[in-house]
Amino acid sequence: MKVLGLETSCDETGLAIFDSELLAEGKNGLLGQVLYSQIELHATYGGVVPELASRDHIRKLVPLLDELLAQCDISKDEIDAIAYTKGPGLIGALMTGALFGRSLAYGLDVPAIGIHHMEGHLLSPLLGPNPPKFPFVSLLVSGGHTLLVAAHGIGEYEILGESIDDAAGECFDKAAKMLGLPYPGGPNVARLAEQGDPLKYELPRPMLHRGLDFSFSGMKTAVHNLIKDTPGSDNDEQVRADIAASFQHAVVDTLVKKCVKALKQTGMKQLVIAGGVSANLHLRQTLEQQLAKIGATVHYAPLELCTDNGAMIAYAGYQRLQAGQQDALSVSCVPRWNISDLPALAQ
């Protein structure tokens, strides 16, 4: 089964083809993928402009599909099914991918299925060289979401904790903006932090000892006050690097301690981390160090699959389609969608 995956939930236009026949050859099933990022488009505004994102998806979907088919050396008539991101995300951006995918499926007379964006992220480490086995705890951490999920099987998701305000990735973006760094903030903060002292400034870790929920709004305020009150924060590169490193350390420390607590609470021994922030090297290294102390392992998606991409949608779509799930012909998107509301796959 060849499944075309379409990802248009925010500011990346991602297309990929998952081919189940490749699994028999010991491969991960990914036949090919293409990804277009709108970073340059939104950088001027310091963040994603929803209307511009939607219009750019419309411009890119057809040429990217042509590029993908050429890369995979197949025709569109060889596509057996289509999976598109149904939510959560920006409603206009979601609708562009959903309408394109559903229309293409209708024209090809193949099934189409809407996929939960965060389920795509959660399953993406299964495409990696060291895939986890169910059950596991998953940390889903991105610009729009931060949550801990106990995954007992595909569709069997229990939310253990989530952010009650800002997502970790959003906090990175806001801190970057305060430091005068360009969009997207996460990679630029991490780059600046490499030259800084992570212990130079003590920043709060809100809700660190209160269950498994997260809160990052207080940390954002603390960074704002630190920048305002610290001489040289606007022109001394070492001071700026120390602030970035201290901020990154505080966020990572919070995420890691919550992950350790979740593993101990559930008794599980595998942690899966996915989403854009999962590419952060300091987070990966700290998780590996701390999880080794409790006899647990950590699994990541390949770096190219940490950001939004079509491969994770194609794979999630394949899993649900081959289990017999079908969607109605109507097109509907869900900008706010709880992952625990997804149906479990029939065993």
UniProtKB/Swiss-Prot annotation:
UniProt: substrate binding residues: 140-144, 173, 186, 280
Subcellular location: Cytoplasm
Broad class of the protein's primary localization: cytoplasm
A single GO BP: tRNA threonylcarbamoyladenosine modification
Annotated residues for binding of Fe cation: 117, 121, 308
Catalytically driven reaction(s): L-threonylcarbamoyladenylate + adenosine(37) in tRNA = N(6)-L-threonylcarbamoyladenosine(37) in tRNA + AMP + H(+)
Needed co-factor(s): Fe(2+)
Enzyme class: transferase
Its EC number(s): 2.3.1.234
GO molecular function term, any single one: N(6)-L-threonylcarbamoyladenine synthase activity
Cofactor binding note from Swiss-Prot or TrEMBL: Binds 1 Fe(2+) ion per subunit.
Family the UniProt entry places it in: Belongs to the KAE1 / TsaD family.
PANTHER family per record: TRNA N6-ADENOSINE THREONYLCARBAMOYLTRANSFERASE, TRNA N6-ADENOSINE THREONYLCARBAMOYLTRANSFERASE, MITOCHONDRIAL
Name this polypeptide is given: tRNA N6-adenosine threonylcarbamoyltransferase
Record organism: Psychrobacter sp. (strain PRwf-1)
Lineage: Bacteria, Pseudomonadati, Pseudomonadota, Gammaproteobacteria, Moraxellales
